[in-house]
Curated annotation (Swiss-Prot):
Catalytic activity field: Transfers a segment of a (1->4)-alpha-D-glucan chain to a primary hydroxy group in a similar glucan chain
Keyword Glycosyltransferase attached: yes
Subunit record text: Monomer.
Name of the protein: 1,4-alpha-glucan branching enzyme GlgB
Record function comment: Catalyzes the formation of the alpha-1,6-glucosidic linkages in glycogen by scission of a 1,4-alpha-linked oligosaccharide from growing alpha-1,4-glucan chains and the subsequent attachment of the oligosaccharide to the alpha-1,6 position.
Keywords: Carbohydrate metabolism, Glycogen biosynthesis, Glycogen metabolism, Glycosyltransferase, Transferase
Cellular component terms (Gene Ontology): cytosol
Native source organism of the sequence: Nitrosospira multiformis (strain ATCC 25196 / NCIMB 11849 / C 71)
Statement: the UniProt record of this protein carries the keyword Transferase: yes
Gene Ontology MF, one: cation binding
Family per similarity comment: Belongs to the glycosyl hydrolase 13 family. GlgB subfamily.
Length: 746
């Protein structure tokens, strides 16, 4: 086949499409570039501003294209169509080196692929897998491999893909608009794996040119770079089918849940200060977690973020594992290894706000797209970040898809949702006049409430056994109650009230604790209003708050004893458990994300003792059914004595479903209590299965010689009693020797 010179080639110099293309304002490049029928003939146009010459591959070989405009527009005209797809041979002249000649397939010979159905669901806020439509994807079209790019930018006049493969030139690869949906798309053949790219966006109203990274990218360059990376094929082979099947049917309400909260960048580091990779964490963190008896790891946000000091809470890449620690496959390797060892993995996820960095979501297409225009709704005053516009359907699709992506692609076992209180209230951390009420005149963020309910419905329906945990610091009712009864639908909520009361109480000198006894007992008034997690999280050991050990009063002996007592209280009180890394061995310094934990302190006997106590408590918590099986049921707890304020002693029973129980006695003063009588529900022998004052933990080794028998004397409204020695600043756990206490099946 050949081009016919007798064909009259009309001039394009006055063509408005040409002028729009050259001005960077052409919203439908397919109307001008690629193959067309014009004036009864076939024409192929290509725009390559750096080309000296272009040839097109026809049935007769490569034929020269005519330069139709000096800016780099080339044409080929024929009487019959070219077979698709076709290749272009491009020669780029250089004054410093031989001409560079290369062959490419024409991007504008491949029609758009995004479906109208997906666009409809996306615009309705109901597309839970928008990450499959938007972003960059390896695809093959007509036997040609390449990358399909798509992005949402409804207020753009033109969007181009720019990257290392096209000299970052926004003229070369303008995308096609899908009209009112606001989505732009382009398939580019032959994009090299892991190429850097961004979107160049021209705002419709101002003409401003913006350079934005891809919100849906799955991998970014290592900070301080901000470009997205073109995708590469995953080589991950999962080996956690057994774990996933068991998770789908597990009764998590009655199962041990003991979370080790980890900041991946500062748990441990190499001698030169560099991070451990995801794979290295699998080699080092995972064995440690197993040794210590935790059931889950909760990772502080590992979605991509530009600033190390934000700990991940200022997310810019909601679909990408941060490249600080490796690739997505590396993270999958870590999670897979955890599952094979029986450890779950929870991700700290941040849908409450996003940073103002100009390269990312903020004013993405020159308008307030993901955020509110009005700063009274769109600006978080505490953190200087933007608040998502939950009332915008496409934003809802974005966030729901982000959650779906992490749970689906990475087999994560749950999401801890950060800063829920800031989402629920329009006046959160605002003075009168600094916020706008909802349509009913109230302070509740109705759109955020709807979003959270939809999030939880999606997670629980599509990912059986996956958990959602809310960091919610107010008394909002029903956070962990089902949506069908008016709740938000979370699996669990952090018990911030218990945590605050407990730490305030523990800071008191034991001499004065008798005057604050209610801080230990008040929590039972609301303990079953939600499914609670008892957290001693990273938030309690930063910003001048000191370490947990540093909060404990007294000399060194008392500080360590107090901390062992605190952990005994936490691990025996109703609710699932969470501790931040370093708590378990009594790190002395406040956490600093720029260095690893103070592991050298384990050479000190007291620190090693706290670690051993934490390990043994973790193992007892999992082994003794009464300590975990009825965390959310009032029938699982009973006070023995909550009134002994003068001695600062409390005692209570924890019950399993089979009737077995554990007796917990806690002494919050440094004064030993000899012949201290405790009422018990059953006569017989009681085994002391834990004593935080044991010499193995660094204590004084005062106790009850392993077991004790009832006296036959009723006490504290119980049918019998035991008389015990209560060590100073210590907690004791007893079980009845005739009842099957260690029975996780109930």
């Amino acid at each position: 086949m050949r081009a016919y010179p007798t064909i009259q080639r009309p001039s394009i110099k006055r063509d408005p499409r040409l002028h729009a293309l050259l001005a960077g304002r052409l919203h439908d490049p397919f109307s001008f570039l690629g193959p067309h029928v014009e004036h009864g003939h076939w024409v192929v146009r290509a725009f390559h501003p750096h080309a000296a010459s272009i040839w097109i591959n026809t049935d007769d070989g490569f034929e020269s294209m005519t330069r139709a405009h000096p800016a780099g527009v080339f044409e080929w005209w024929g009487l019959i169509p070219l077979p698709l797809p076709y290749q272009l041979r491009i020669e780029e002249a250089s004054f410093e080196a031989p001409a560079h000649v290369y062959d490419i397939y024409d991007a504008y010979a491949f029609p758009p692929q995004v479906s109208e159905h997906d666009l409809y669901l996306f615009n309705e806020g109901r597309l839970h897998q928008a990450y499959r439509m938007l972003g960059s994807h390896l695809v093959e079209m007509e036997g040609v491999a390449g990358v399909r790019f798509s992005v949402w930018a409804p207020n753009a006049e033109r969007v181009s893909v720019v990257g290392s493969f096209n000299r970052w030139d926004g003229r070369i690869h303008p995308m096609v608009s899908h009209g009112a949906s606001g989505v732009w798309e382009l398939f580019i053949p032959g994009v090299p794996t892991d190429s850097f790219y961004k979107y160049e966006i021209r705002n419709r109203d101002t003409g401003a040119i913006l350079l934005k990274t891809d919100p849906y990218a799955r991998h970014y360059e290592v900070r301080p770079g901000t470009a997205a990376r073109a995708p590469s094929a995953s080589r991950m082979t999962w080996g956690d089918a057994r774990w996933m099947a068991q998770r789908a049917v597990w009764d998590w309400l009655a199962t041990p849940l003991n979370i080790y909260e980890v900041h991946a960048g500062s748990w441990k580091r190499h001698a030169n200060g560099s991070f451990y990779s995801y794979r290295e964490l699998a080699d080092h963190l995972l064995p440690y977690v197993r040794e210590m008896g935790y059931t889950h790891i909760e990772l502080l946000p590992i979605s991509e973020h530009p600033l190390d000091e934000s700990w991940g809470y200022q997310t810019t890449g909601y679909f990408a594992a941060t490249s600080r620690y490796g690739t997505s496959d590396d993270l999958k390797f870590f999670i897979n290894a955890c599952h094979q060892e029986g450890i779950g993995v929870i991700l700290d996820w941040v849908p409450a706000h996003f940073p103002q960095d100009a390269f990312a979501l903020a004013r993405f297409d020159g308008s307030a797209l993901y955020e509110h225009e009005d700063p009274r709704m769109g600006l978080h005053q505490d953190w200087g970040t933007h608040i998502f516009n939950y009332g915008r359907n496409e934003v809802k699709s974005f966030l729901l898809s982000s959650a779906h992506y992490w749970l689906s692609e990475f087999h994560l076992d749950g999401l801890r949702v950060d800063a829920v209180a800031s989402m629920l209230y329009l006046d959160y951390s605002r003075l009168p006049g600094e916020w706008l009420p909802n349509r009913y005149g109230g302070r509740e963020n109705l759109e955020a409430i709807d979003f959270l309910r939809e999030l939880n419905i999606m997670v629980h329906q599509e990912f059986p056994g996956a958990l959602t945990l809310a960091e919610e610091s107010t008394a909002w009712p029903g956070v962990s109650r089902p949506t069908y009864v008016g709740g938000l639908g979370f699996s669990m909520k952090w018990n911030m009230g218990w945590m605050n009361d407990t730490l305030v109480y523990m800071r008191n000198d034991p001499v004065y604790r008798r005057f604050h006894h209610e801080q230990l007992t008040f929590g039972q008034l609301y303990a079953y209003s939600e499914n609670f997690v008892l957290p001693f999280s990273h938030d309690e050991v930063v910003h001048g708050k000191g370490s947990l050990l540093g909060k404990m009063p007294g000399d060194a002996w008392q500080q360590f004893a107090n901390l062992r007592l605190l952990f005994t209280y936490q691990m025996t009180y109703p609710g699932k458990k969470l501790n931040f890394m370093g708590n378990e061995f009594a790190q002395g310094r406040e956490w600093n994300s720029s260095r690893e934990l103070d592991w050298y302190q384990l050479g000190d006997g007291w620190h090693e003792g706290v670690k051993m106590a934490a390990r043994d408590l973790n193992q007892l918590y999992s082994a003794v059914a009464a300590l975990h099986q009825r965390d959310f049921e009032p029938e699982g707890f009973s006070w023995v004595d909550c009134h002994d304020a003068d001695n600062s002693v409390i005692s209570y029973l924890r019950f399993a479903r089979n009737g077995s129980f554990a007796l917990v006695v806690l002494n919050f003063t440094p004064v030993p209590r000899y012949r201290y009588r405790i009422g018990v529900p059953t006569s017989g022998s009681y085994q002391e299965i834990f004593n935080s004052d044991s010499r193995y933990y660094g204590g004084s080794d005062l106790g009850n010689m392993g077991s004790i028998r009832t006296t036959g004397q009723p006490s504290m409204e119980r049918m019998d009693s035991i008389v015990i020695t209560l060590p100073p600043l210590a907690g004791l756990i007893f079980v009845h020797t005739d009842l099957p206490a260690i029975n996780t099946d109930g």
